[in-house]
């Protein structure tokens, strides 16, 4: 009788759970496994490159909130998919998720070159405001058309590490083999007199070591994580001013997203949005930590002031901005949308 009464008492509880849409615990056999790829060094949820940590935080929280219905396998360091192939893999549904420098795909989707347009973004808050403005909605639509969904918005500032001489003003770039990370950034550096070599950030160490590159522009996180301080003699940081801001979001294949239940989709988007505060905090910390790490390694540390920034911006408008406006479909309209966000 006691067992029967206990079971009867549980009936309304079970019914309430069903009605509320709360996910029920999943067995290992029933769980959906989602694979996440990225090109950055692997670590733990508490230590290492913040991008790897963010991915692990996302996976842990989504698995917790879905009661194990969704589980994740994380592949750092380009171990599953090569860096520049990740968006294509998302588009075809061959890969579930990635944290990815979107401008890497500017050849396939020219419009996304605006996400590493030199001197367009001038501070983090401006970049994050794109999300709810027309430029952000247009970017979301473009990615949707390519079977890709933005889960977490991440903007990163960056600087330049060099082993020949300091690079502060545009003229310092003349005659050097340089890497800007995207078409528009490379156009600026070319206009400044640099010779462009395009490599993903996880190959910059070997490129600089072998002499393929004299200078590397990349995010503060990558300048530290890929240990370029072991090779550089000078670094110009982003802690005061920089023309280098890159959109590097956490993305999911729409094929994967559409295969989730409405409740699972809701959890994925909520967790993704919740990690944006962690991302911006980590990036600002990395901008400062970069100077500390490089200084400790004996590298000469430099900063950019407003006057120098305006020199780069003038050259960017004459080169990368103009090319984008003239040669990309709706390029002028997209640039106007972006510049409307302050």
Predicted segments, located by residue:
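Bacterial N-terminal signal peptides that target proteins for export
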Residues: 1-11, 21-22
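C-terminal segment of classical bacterial N-terminal signal peptides
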Residues: 16-25
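N-terminal secretory/targeting leader peptides
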Residues: 29-126, 135, 143-342
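Short beta-strand-centered segments that line the small-molecule binding cleft or hinge
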Residues: 129
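Alpha-helical scaffold segments in soluble metabolic enzymes
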Residues: 138
């Amino acid at each position: 009788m006691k067992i029967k009464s206990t079971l009867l008492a549980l009936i309304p509880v079970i019914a309430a759970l069903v009605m509320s849409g709360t996910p029920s615990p999943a067995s290992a056999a029933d769980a959906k496994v989602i694979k996440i790829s990225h090109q950055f060094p692997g670590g733990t949820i508490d230590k290492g490159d913040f991008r790897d940590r963010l991915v692990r935080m996302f996976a842990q929280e989504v698995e917790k909130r879905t009661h194990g219905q969704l589980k994740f396998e994380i592949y750092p360091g380009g171990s599953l998919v090569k860096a520049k192939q990740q968006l294509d893999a998302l588009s075809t549904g061959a890969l579930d998720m990635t944290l990815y420098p979107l401008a890497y795909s500017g050849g396939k989707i020219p419009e996304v070159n605006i996400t590493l347009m030199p001197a367009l973004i001038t501070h983090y808050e401006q970049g994050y405001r794109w999300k709810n403005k027309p430029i952000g909605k247009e970017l979301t639509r473009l990615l949707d058309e390519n079977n890709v969904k933005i889960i977490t918005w991440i903007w990163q500032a960056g600087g330049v590490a060099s082993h020949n001489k300091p690079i502060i003003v545009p003229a310092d770039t003349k005659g050097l083999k340089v890497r800007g990370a995207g078409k528009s950034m490379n156009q600026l550096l070319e206009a400044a007199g640099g010779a462009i070599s395009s490599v993903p950030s996880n190959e910059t160490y070997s490129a600089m070591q072998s002499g393929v590159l004299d200078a590397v522009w990349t995010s503060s996180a990558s300048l530290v994580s890929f240990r370029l301080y072991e090779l550089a003699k000078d670094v110009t940081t982003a802690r005061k001013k920089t023309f280098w801001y890159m959109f590097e979001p956490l993305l999911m294949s729409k094929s994967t997203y559409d295969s989730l239940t409405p409740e699972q989709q809701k959890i994925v988007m909520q967790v993704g949005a919740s990690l944006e505060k962690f991302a911006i905090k980590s990036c600002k910390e990395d901008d400062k930590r970069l100077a500390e790490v490089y200084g400790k390694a004996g590298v000469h540390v430099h900063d950019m002031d407003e006057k120098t920034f305006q020199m780069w911006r003038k050259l960017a408008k004459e080169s990368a901005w103009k090319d984008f406006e003239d040669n990309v479909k709706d390029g002028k309209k997209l640039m106007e949308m972006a510049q409307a966000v302050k």
